[in-house]
Amino acid sequence: FSIGASYESAQQKMARGMAGSAVLSVKAANGAIKTDELPPLSSIEAGVGVLKGTALYHENGYYETIDLIAADLTELDKINPPHLANGEKITDFTGSLVILPDRFTLKYGINKGDTIHLQINGATVPLQAADIANYDTVFLRHTRGATALLPLSTMAGLLDQTDGYSEILIKPAAGADTAVLKNEISAALPAPAYIVSEVVNEAQIAADARQKSMPFFLISFFSMTMSVFIIYSSYKVITLDRLPVIGTFRSIGAEKKTVTRIFLLESLLYGSAGGLLGIPLGIVVLKLILHGMGQSLSQGIEIPAVISPLSAVISFTMAVSVAFLS
């Protein structure tokens, strides 16, 4: 359960990436879309226009795909503010500047103030690294490559798109239902002229998490079954080992039911001890597994361990049950 929940949490974080607290995306089927095309709905708290593009970075024989994004920083802060590595705010962000995530700059040895060259629309464009950002919010991604933030005016000039945006990200007002809001926007901006979609496909993320955790469910099931079988098949050996104890109990007048009850309490003690010791040990193993899974994801994102109280209770209950069934 914890592996699936942890992986799902990480995938949701990566999938949200640039969108942040926005839940819907609105695009024009052909060309750009303007923010004033959005209907004036009270259920919309913010509509942020975003320009998108792609570039290619070449260094020492390596090619890296760069996703370019640009937006009004004041508006972007409403849904997903970028975080600089030095903790400062983004200021004087105009001209041929670019902000890159720290994982990308560390990989290629890029420092603040360095000039990099990106191939955009077939032309080589020099850009100065204005700042280094943390690998989160708008720079977080679930595919390989990197994301770079450019000034809106610079991006518009490079893409020759000075009027409108690639998409508008919608942040709902407090208490607004996403499905209802989507229907309201779709009614005001009907298909096929506009495309209204949810930013995160929760069903797909949950399905991916189940697929990742299924092998561990099977391993746990077979391990538990084998434990019961091994202990049960060794019943005669255990009985012989307990004969002196049984004889002592019977010699002082203990009935068969009393002896059985004592051994069941012993099983309860062993099961409880195993559960209490196994849970912290399992947390350590879980973190090691998630670390390995995180390295297999693009950019090696760290998957935080998500351990719910229900998972701990189920683990403890299973430990006691195995002891009793054995």
Description of each model-found segment:
Residues 1-225, 237, 295, 303:
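Membrane transport/envelope proteins' first extracytoplasmic loop
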Residues 8, 12, 240-252, 286-295:
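Juxtamembrane helix-loop transition segments at the membrane interface in multi-pass membrane proteins
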Residues 213-214, 244, 257, 310:
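Residues that define the loop-to-transmembrane-helix transition and helix capping
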Residues 215-218, 222, 228, 261, ...:
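Alpha-helical transmembrane segments of multi-pass inner-membrane proteins
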Residues 229-271:
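Interfacial "coupling" helices/loops that link adjacent transmembrane helices in transporter permeases
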Residues 233-235, 269-300, 310-326:
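Small-residue-rich transmembrane alpha-helices
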Residues 306-307:
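Interfacial loop-to-helix junctions that mark the boundaries of transmembrane helices
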